[in-house]
Amino acid sequence: MQNNTILNEGKLLYTQKKYDKALAFFLGLPTDSPADKIEVSYYLGLCYTKLERYDDALLFLEQVVTSGGNFERVLQCRFLLAVIYALSGRRRLADFELNKLLETGYMTASVYAAIAFVAWEQNDTERCMSYYEQSLRKDPDNVSSLNGLGYVLAYQEKDLTRALSLCKQAVKSAPKSAACLDSLGWVYYKLGLYKDALQYLQQAEQIDTMNVEIAEHIKSVRLKSGH
């Protein structure tokens, strides 16, 4: 079997979204396999990311980034590293990776959205909104930024009309996203439209049943509405 076809089975499993099976395939490769080690690390990093095993993902994504190989692949892994760092509270590392990406011009709208998310986690609301705005100037249909800015505007009780418009657009693009449904429900809550708020928040909870924030939002609506 040629080197460039050894990994085809694992790649196919990954594209079919069978991430557990793809992971097992790549982990099961013999140590003396002639397959490209960096390519194996790349797919292991992707599989672990999809399975939300972020600490495991970091190990392999960092290997790809430090290899200095395929430029597009390195940039993709930098972006995933930044998102994982942000989610796990390692904000300085997230900032470092995101700024490196900005220097290259890679996926600019998504990078701006990620920086905005990090800023929100740091309670820097003005910087957060500024980067969401920059993201939407680059890509007016970026779902993360539509949803993120809409939620922040609602949270700050600033321009609820625009917040509603942004969140509606996000839900239209991603109707099965618990995050987008939650944000839209929260805007309706801020507008005092509790029936609509509960409708979307409950949809969000059905998709992401263990989400504490969604549960808290539903509790807030019920307290206000008397249900």
What kind of region is each of these model predictions?
Residues 8, 43, 80, 114, ...:
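Canonical tetratricopeptide repeat
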